[in-house]
Every structure is written in structure tokens, then in C-alpha cells.
Amino acid sequence: EAEMTKAIQEGKPFYLNMSHYAVHQPFEADHRYLDKYKDSGKGHMAEAFATLVEGMDKSLGDLMQYLEDQGVAENTLILFLGDNGGDAPLGGPADYGSSAPLRGKKGSEYEGGVRVPFIAAWAKPDAKNKFQKKYPIAQNAVQLQQGTVMDLYPTILSVAHVKPPKHYALDGADLKKLFQGKEDKKHRDDFLMHFPHGEHRANYFTTYRKGDWKLIYYYH
């Protein structure tokens, strides 16, 4: 917070990367919210997981309130996403549980192990804001085209109107059209996941997804 406050006071842009560890094993309950879930019937571990999700949500809410209080919410882009498939203690690696309605969970070869939540929004939408006019984001919309973490770097550069260093190879692409709720026919629709190094809730595998199709190859 101190670094952001300093940047705001100096009229400089800032970048904050906030990685929550809370929604991760071991699932130690956040006791601020435990009473809300004690009669869920889902078991102690699942109840603990739910409190961690709510705690993370509270943390993000606090951050957004800080941006509002500092008067920079309209100028701040928030990208909220997971780093892997769901890991809630609900069902096994190949079940429709922690990532329902997707099958599988963290470490599995199924969509529930690969696809993650990804929300992009201005902290305070304002159609008249000069930054939001240059980089509009559709509200209350779901984008079905895929994006990956590799797309974040070129997207952030685009928002900031910064060009990458000359001869610097980019693996990703700007998500601007996708954020607008439009189809980007130039955006890649294939994705390769190569995981033959060791077992983590699944077999040794490689998966390749193209459009609505997915190929899974098992090494044994």
C-alpha cells in the first residue's frame, strides 16, 4: 500500500502483482467466516476452503476500496485470475467436483485442471474516462475465446501504450478485442499442455486443444 500511495502522490503509474496463497493447501480455515459454513454438510475441509475464498474476496474488496478512496479507481485496470484448475476438496481428479461444471481439478488433464476464472475490469467503470475510452472493456459479458497467462504481458503493455523492447519475442497477444466482447479471428485458438514429468493426480500426459476439440495422449 505504501508503494501505491507514493506513486499516486507523485502522479506516477503503478503496477501491483498480488498473489494470494490462502486458497491453497493446507486448507486452514479463516475463522472470521467459519460460522457461515459450519452447517453446509460438505465436510470440514470444504468449509475451510469456503472461508479462504471469502477471505480472498474480502482482500480484493479492500484493495478496490483503497483505489476508490485514493481517487484512482477509474484509471486502474484489474485482472483477476487463477493460476491453475480448481483445488477445492470436492471430488477426485477426474470427477465433476471442485471445478464443476468442468471435469477434473488442479493437475488433471481435463478442462477443470486447465481452465481458470479470468475477470478483467476497470476498478470503477466510467465511459467518459480517457483511459477507458482507449481501452474499453465490455461489462456483464462472457468471452468464450480463450486467453492464457502469456497474453497478460502484451495486454498490459497495450493498456499502458508501451512498446516491448526491439527484437523481444512475445509468446502472447493483446487481448483488447476479447476484452471488448468481440471476436478476434487472429487470436490463437489452440493450446498445448505437456506434462510427462511425473504423476500429480493424473497419468503422464500431453493434451492439445483446438477450438472445441481436445486430444489427450497418455504415456502409460
Per-region residue spans from a language model:
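Non-transmembrane alpha-helical segments in soluble domains
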Residues: 1-8, 50, 57, 61-64, ...
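Active-site His/acidic residue clusters
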Residues: 2-49, 87-93
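Loop/turn elements at helix/coil->beta-strand transitions in domains of secreted/extracellular proteins
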Residues: 9-16, 72-78, 114-116, 186-189, ...
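Metal-dependent active-site segment of extracytoplasmic phospho-/sulfohydrolases and closely related
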Residues: 13, 19-20, 55-94
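Active-site-proximal beta-strand/loop segments in catalytic clefts of secreted hydrolases
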Residues: 18-22, 30, 81-84, 114, ...
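Short acidic-aromatic active-site loops that bind/stabilize oxyanions
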Residues: 46-54, 142
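C-terminal cap/loop subdomain of S1 sulfatases and analogous C-terminal strand-loop tails that border
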Residues: 86-111, 126-131, 135-141, 145, ...
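Structural micro-motif
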Residues: 115-119, 153
